[in-house]
Swiss-Prot record:
One of the record's GO molecular function terms: protein-L-isoaspartate (D-aspartate) O-methyltransferase activity
Biological process, per Gene Ontology: methylation; protein modification process; protein repair
Protein known as: Protein-L-isoaspartate O-methyltransferase
Cellular component, GO, one term: cytoplasm
Amino acid sequence: MVESQIIARGVSDRRVIEAMLKVPRHVFVEEAMAAQAYSDTPLPIGEKQTISQPYMVALMTELLELKGKEKVLEIGTGSGYQAAILAVMADRVYTVERIRPLALRARKALDSLGLLNVNIKMSDGTVGWEDEAPFDAIIVTAGAPDIPQQYIDQLKPGGRLVIPVGTQFEQVLVRVVKQEDGSVERENITGCRFVKLVGKFGWSSDD
């Protein structure tokens, strides 16, 4: 999976590659989907949610430029797979999931791998996690109509934010770097498709 789907498509950060090799993706999918766990495609995980394709996980993680000592916020725990990759690469991971069954399942999977540096909160991810801010990096695994200001506010100067922004059906992956004066530099990376980011500062669940 890593050689053909990730390295071949341009991901070169050695720490990302090592994390992808270390974390078993099949642990984070339902048993019936285990045979497809290492294909480069999103897979359903229940509750109308998906586990992201491995390439997108690798790309988004690479864009965070993690060195090992960071405090990272993830919005949208989902299966827990992205949080597991972050846990291998960073010091502390804080992840927010609004759907209780997914949060509980992710916690169980992370614990089974001994990844105890991940904190999961069941809440509205669009408001971030103010009590634990600021963060060195923030990654959002659902598509937003725009970038919530809360994420910018909770990012350290020099911090990186990676988030899909667009419509409910297609987005552009955006990388934001917060400057020392509080301003931001924004870069569009590539087109993508994620489930919608639901919450106070995202999409309505009825949209």
